[in-house]
């Protein structure tokens, strides 16, 4: 459970102690960090979401 790589303005740790702030993970673990907009019901593995936009490949 490696930490997510987040934007410089945010922090994200998907380890045992899950903490996410302004998270824009490039590797999203939905169970830990809600990195995609609320409209996304599920994050695809390895999806990349920027800001409030979410590509079709990100949501399943």
From Swiss-Prot:
Domain notes from UniProt: Class I metallothioneins contain 2 metal-binding domains: four divalent ions are chelated within cluster A of the alpha domain and are coordinated via cysteinyl thiolate bridges to 11 cysteine ligands. Cluster B, the corresponding region within the beta domain, can ligate three divalent ions to 9 cysteines.
Region span, Beta: 1-28
Protein name per the record: Metallothionein
Binding-site residues for a divalent metal cation 1, renumbered to this chain: 4, 6, 20, 23
Residues that bind a divalent metal cation 6: 36, 40, 43, 59
Binding residue positions for a divalent metal cation 3: 14, 18, 23, 28
Record: residues binding a divalent metal cation 7: 49, 54, 58-59
Residues at which a divalent metal cation 5 binds: 33, 35-36, 49
GO molecular function, one term: metal ion binding
Keyword Cytoplasm carried by entry: no
Function: Metallothioneins have a high content of cysteine residues that bind various heavy metals.
Binding, a divalent metal cation 2: 6, 12, 14, 25
Keyword list, A-Z: Metal-binding, Metal-thiolate cluster
Region (Alpha): 29-60
Membership in a protein family: Belongs to the metallothionein superfamily. Type 1 family.
Alphabetical list of Pfam families matching this protein: Metallothio (PF00131)
Species in which this protein is naturally found: Rutilus rutilus (Roach)
Residues noted as binding a divalent metal cation 4 in the record, renumbered to the chain: 32-33, 43, 47
